[in-house]
Amino acid sequence: MKVGIVGSGMVGSATAYALALLGVAREVVLVDLDRKLAQAHAEDILHATPFAHPVWVRAGSYGDLEGARAVVLAAGVAQRPGETRLQLLDRNAQVFAQVVPRVLEAAPEAVLLVATNPVDVMTQVAYRLSGLPPGRVVGSGTILDTARFRALLAEYLRVAPQSVHAYVLGEHGDSEVLVWSSAQVGGVPLLEFAEARGRALSPEDRARIDEGVRRAAYRIIEGKGATYYGIGAGLARLVRAILTDEKGVYTVSAFTPEVEGVLEVSLSLPRILGAGGVEGTVYPSLSPEEREALRRSAEILKEAAFALGF
């Protein structure tokens, strides 16, 4: 099975590396305007495969994407320190206007997996440019924010993060919504579990975890210029869900006809992900405050996409 990655920067190359380590695909093709960069990353990652799985990693052109089951769109300009994801819009929308048609010319049956920030709006841009059914254009959305939320809760409660079930919805960015009301640990409501564990969550604890999730990307960007390992692993996990027709539930971004009264917006909700992309949405139980926060997040994304004409 072939996977394409358009954009061989930090996110694209980290995704290719994660795919190779996980053995998700048989072939990974890196496409980039900077052919030398794509070739260098491909060769370096290929040299890691003897220690992992037999994956053929190579650089190529758009034509080499033919037959790809999934294509990761990681092309674009990097987020600058202090820059919000929504401020990236004008620059990255222009990139997608060139990239999306060329990808679909070579791989018309592929699921498009959008990684370029601001990912929710770029998912909407890719969807409008592609003419594909909504489920075939999937954004990485809040998969990383959800992972951060679960990891911080697990750290506080001293349990494995795999036992924590909690979601971050809406924008992958400043207006994201941490869903505390329906969070569970081992099937037990979060607050009940925390009390039983002797680790009751005070308002200060919740505020600290919220800040830890919401500001993580900014701290990392300030320290080293970009985030890529976490999202690379997350994207590889989404690719595996597509290639294996897993039908797992992930907080990914997709075009949504209506959410909390806001029409035609791309944002993250728990989605069932399989071979055809998004196959359904699992709308979680939300408190009134969370519903209002999700509505505001949807409005922000809707306005940003509308300003671009998408």
UniProtKB/Swiss-Prot annotation:
UniProt binding sites for substrate: Q79, R85, N117, P118, V119, D120, D145, T146, A147, R148, T227
Entry superkingdom: Bacteria
Temperature effects on activity: Optimum temperature is close to 90 degrees Celsius.
Principal subcellular localization: cytoplasm
Gene Ontology biological-process entries: glycolytic process; lactate metabolic process
Residues involved in beta-D-fructose 1,6-bisphosphate binding: R150, H165
Binding site for NAD(+): M10, V11, D32, Y62, G76, V77, A115, T116, N117, S140
Catalytic activity entry: (S)-lactate + NAD(+) = pyruvate + NADH + H(+)
UniProt keyword terms in alphabetical order: Allosteric enzyme, Cytoplasm, NAD, Oxidoreductase, Phosphoprotein
GO molecular function: L-lactate dehydrogenase activity
One GO location term (cellular component): cytoplasm
Localization, UniProt: Cytoplasm
Listed pathway(s): Fermentation; pyruvate fermentation to lactate; (S)-lactate from pyruvate: step 1/1
SS bonds (residue pairs): none
Regulation affecting activity: Allosterically activated by fructose 1,6-bisphosphate (FBP).
Stored InterPro entries: L-lactate/malate_DH, L-lactate_DH, L-lactate_DH_AS, Lactate/malate_DH_C, Lactate/malate_DH_N, Lactate_DH/Glyco_Ohase_4_C, NAD(P)-bd_dom_sf
CDD domains membership: LDH_2
Record-annotated membrane-spanning stretches: none
Catalytic residue positions: H172 (proton acceptor)
Residue(s) carrying Phosphotyrosine: Y218
EC number of the protein: 1.1.1.27
Database matches in PANTHER family: L-2-HYDROXYCARBOXYLATE DEHYDROGENASE (NAD(P)(+)) (PTHR43128), L-LACTATE DEHYDROGENASE (PTHR43128:SF16)
Family: Belongs to the LDH/MDH superfamily. LDH family.
Assembly mode: Homotetramer.
Role this protein plays: Catalyzes the conversion of lactate to pyruvate.
Name by which UniProt lists this protein: L-lactate dehydrogenase
Gene: ldh
